[in-house]
Every structure is written in C-alpha cells, then in structure tokens.
C-alpha cells in the first residue's frame, strides 16, 4: 500500500495546539444597548402639548366670558315693569364654574411651563411612570371637575331661558339676552375644556402602555 509508509501518510492534516502553560481568553464584543424613554408614538409629546394648550384656552375663555356676563334689563309682567340685574356672582353654580375654570387653566398652564422647561433642558417630557401616573390623576380630577361645574351652570342657564313650568315665572333671557348668550358660550367652552382634559388623560394611558 503505497499511501502509507514509515508511519506517515501522504496528506497530513496538522492541528496546532496552544502551549500547555498558555491561557486563551475569548472576549466577546460588547454590544451597545441604548434605552430611550420615547414611546412607540414619536409625536405623542406634540399631541400632549396641543391638548393641554387647547384645554387651557377653553378654560380661560369660559372664565372670562362668565365674568363678563352682566346685564340689566326690565321685565314686564301684567303691565308691571320689574327691573332686573343679572350677574354671575348671584349664582353659586356660576361661581363654581368660574372657580373651576380658573383652577383648570392654572393647572394646564403649569403643565405647559413644566414641559417647556424640560424641552429647554432636552429632557423627556414624561421622565418616569410615576410622573405619568400623576399626570393621569390630575387630568382625570380636573376633567371631572369641569364636567361637574359645566353641568351645574347649564342647569341654571336652562332655567333662565325656559323659566319654570306651571308657574308664572317668565323667560328671563328675553330682557337679558347678552347675559344668557355669554353664559351659554362660557358653559360650552367649559365642556370643551373637559373634553380636551379627558383627551390628555387618554394620552397619559397610551404613554403608560408604551414599553
């Protein structure tokens, strides 16, 4: 057999082993892992700023319109002229609406200023889940408060416009149209502020559900 001679083969496969005293250490390449607090929706921060800004504007409009709703008129009943003086401060429901609109506007303004401060420092708008939970709680509280205030004021405005059935109490909005119109627009703005605060709460939930 010519292929084997003197204990050697014609084709030799050599394997070089490391010396006995040497140590081989395999160092894996380090993988750079970067984490970012930005949620799955990159424009979610822009939507959050927009909803809070609109909620603040609606609350300010509700407050300013209700405060300016003052008017004097004359109501004629059976030929008797009765002077009327309509003012938002005469009703506890309208006072509650003004107070809650002011508080809601201040809350939204504080959140916008905080977001602007973080934008200047180039830090995340919502740095932690705890902060997101606080935002969610605040948005929920003020949204429900604006709904409650708007509903109470709407009951008073509807009573002024329609009067009381089965009684001789007339429609006060006929001699006081400006007061009733401003009150109605103010109440509508309050409900819009409630809607945008509720939208902010939904955005907070989306932020919390982000990985």
UniProtKB/Swiss-Prot annotation:
Q: Name one GO cellular component term.
A: plasma membrane
For side Cytoplasmic, which residue ranges?
1-45, 117-131, 208-211
Alphabetically list the UniProt keywords. Cell membrane, Glycoprotein, Membrane, Transmembrane, Transmembrane helix
Localization per record? Cell membrane
Q: Give one Pfam hit by family name.
A: CASP_dom
Q: How does it sit in the membrane?
A: Multi-pass membrane protein
Which segments cross the bilayer? 46-66, 96-116, 132-152, 187-207
Q: Which residues lie on this side of the membrane: Extracellular?
A: 67-95, 153-186
Keyword Disulfide bond applies: no
Glycosylation (residues): 87, 160
Which PANTHER family does the entry mention? CASP-LIKE PROTEIN 3A1 (PTHR33573:SF48), CASP-LIKE PROTEIN 4A4 (PTHR33573)
Q: Which family does it belong to?
A: Belongs to the Casparian strip membrane proteins (CASP) family.
Quaternary structure note: Homodimer and heterodimers.
**Protein name per Swiss-Prot or TrEMBL:** CASP-like protein 3A1
Write the lineage as a comma-separated list: Eukaryota, Viridiplantae, Streptophyta, Embryophyta, Tracheophyta
